[in-house]
Swiss-Prot record:
This is Olfactory receptor 867. It is found in: Cell membrane. Belongs to the G-protein coupled receptor 1 family. One of its GO terms (biological process) is signal transduction. It comes from Rattus norvegicus (Rat). The chain crosses the membrane at residues 7-30, 39-60, 82-101, 121-139, 178-200, 218-241, 254-273.
Length: 312
């Protein structure tokens, strides 16, 4: 792997910590506030969990390599990165689609919302998506395991991205490439089409609304989601469908960095800055932590110096 970025080790560590802390705060805020126990925030907390796992697949290994000043990654570690990146990337994709469908039903069919979007159905869908991605990732890894690689092969990337790994294989990768593009098309284009259709219906419904308050609330919620969708799908499309246009290795790495690191890091800020409910829940969470008895004076450690007994 290409790792000549020692000056940026602190930057990547900071980005990783900000991502984990930000998404963890979203999960804690949603779980600790009963007012946020609805489907929209259920999806958001799931997305935060997936984003933590997504960035944890690549950055820790990269930081270890930078610290040890090596570029090595074992074959098993590379297969593991391919497996988990495919799984968590696919789950990001599915969750963004479900969130778009949730907004579509809430805005366009509010009277039937509780019937169409119920917690049991959505939890079952998420579980089904996890199983689908586990199977797809396993097939990718099994097909990749049949390929031959030379010892000391350099992957022109900062992690084992499937498309880049296939390019350095010494055996025929036709089946791998066909499966990769078919799966990427089905699991990428179909959800993207669903998101576009949902927002086209949402836009037409918003134009018919007379209440400016309702419009603002819908725009703020949908605007945050659209920012995340644009960032994730835009960078992923460049990597998987426009790789022939990006002849520079560094441009491909920057595009990959956008959806594997930047997008998970920005998601908590995008969803919280324009959302009064999330900001309120975070404020209550901070107040609860600050007023915890653990930090009060009575719970500070005390040491009592006892006089030693003098022997007669």
């Amino acid at each position: 792997m290409i790792l000549n970025c020692n000056p940026f080790s602190g930057l990547f560590l900071s980005m990783y910590l900000v991502t984990v802390l930000g998404n963890l705060l979203i999960i804690l805020a949603v779980s600790s506030n009963s007012h946020l126990h609805n489907l929209m925030y259920f999806f958001l907390s799931n997305l935060s969990f997936v984003d933590i796992c997504f960035i944890s697949t690549t950055i820790p290994k990269m930081l270890v390599n930078i610290h040890s000043q090596t570029k090595d990654i074992s074959y098993i570690e590379c297969l593991s990165q391919v497996y988990f990146l495919t799984t968590f990337g696919g789950m990001d994709n599915f969750l963004l689609t479900l969130m778009a469908c949730d907004r579509y039903v809430a805005i366009c069919h509010p009277l039937n919302y509780t019937v169409i979007m119920n917690l049991q159905l959505c939890a079952l869908l998420i579980l089904m998506f996890w199983l689908i991605m586990f199977c797809v990732s396993l097939i990718h890894v099994l097909l990749m395991n049949e390929l031959n690689f030379s010892r000391g092969t350099e992957i022109p990337h900062f992690f084992c991205e499937l498309a880049q790994v296939l390019k350095v294989a010494n055996s025929d990768t036709h089946i791998n490439n066909v499966f990769m593009y078919v799966v990427t098309s089905l699991l990428g284009l179909i959800p993207m089409t669903g998101i576009l259709m949902s927002y086209s219906q949402i836009a037409s419904s918003l134009l018919k609304m007379s209440s400016s308050v309702s419009k603002y609330k819908a725009f703020s919620t949908c605007g945050s989601h659209l920012c995340v969708v644009s960032l994730f799908y835009g960078s992923a499309t460049i990597v998987y469908f426009c790789s022939s246009v990006l002849h520079s290795t560094h441009k491909k790495m920057i595009a990959s960095l956008m959806y594997t690191v930047i997008s998970p890091m920005l998601n908590p800020f995008i969803y919280s800055l324009r959302n009064k409910d999330v900001k309120g829940a975070l404020g209550k969470l901070f107040i609860r932590v600050a007023s915890c008895p653990l930090w009060s004076k009575d719970f500070r450690p005390k040491f009592i110096l006892k006089p030693e007994r003098q022997s007669l």
